[in-house]
Amino acid sequence: MNGSGENVAGCASCAGRCCREYRVAVTVADVRTLAAGTDLHPREFLTLRPVDSTRNGFRTRPRGPAHELNLVRRPANGGCVFLMEIAPGKARCGAYAHRPLVCRSYPTFLRAGAVAVRPDVKCGPGSWSLAAMDLPGYRRDLVHSQAAWTEHWKIVTAWNAALDAAAPDAAPADLYEFLLTGAMPR
């Protein structure tokens, strides 16, 4: 949901279905924003999820399997680590001001350059109306998200190349430190 405050209708009766049913893949920029904004270390909110061998992702072994960065899911409710139950059937993001770009732009995507509502939206029918939404705000967030993912893939490539050149395995803690500082492990 866009942060403008003008688009809360879709989330007003939120039960957190999107935060429970989607895996939330995040960028390096998202990790840094969440860490700085919540004062949490990435090990407290990230998990490395293995991805198909044809996809690019962070590796912890030279030429090893790739992983994407996902927000941790709580075993108790299956939801995102930041999902807060505020009342029965009502949930909100506990890191709202620092939430990932994919969450910020939900439930929209760009179709031929125009903002559109995802066809697989988890909210109830009629929750989102383009006529009532801050379309310039969503467009800005979507364009920003595309740029962040472009930068993310450059960082993934740099990490993997450095790992391949150095030859030792890297622990997840090394990767998390790299995400925060940009410094490769020694």
Language model feature labels by segment:
Residues M1-R186:
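Short loop/turn segments that flank or connect secondary-structure elements
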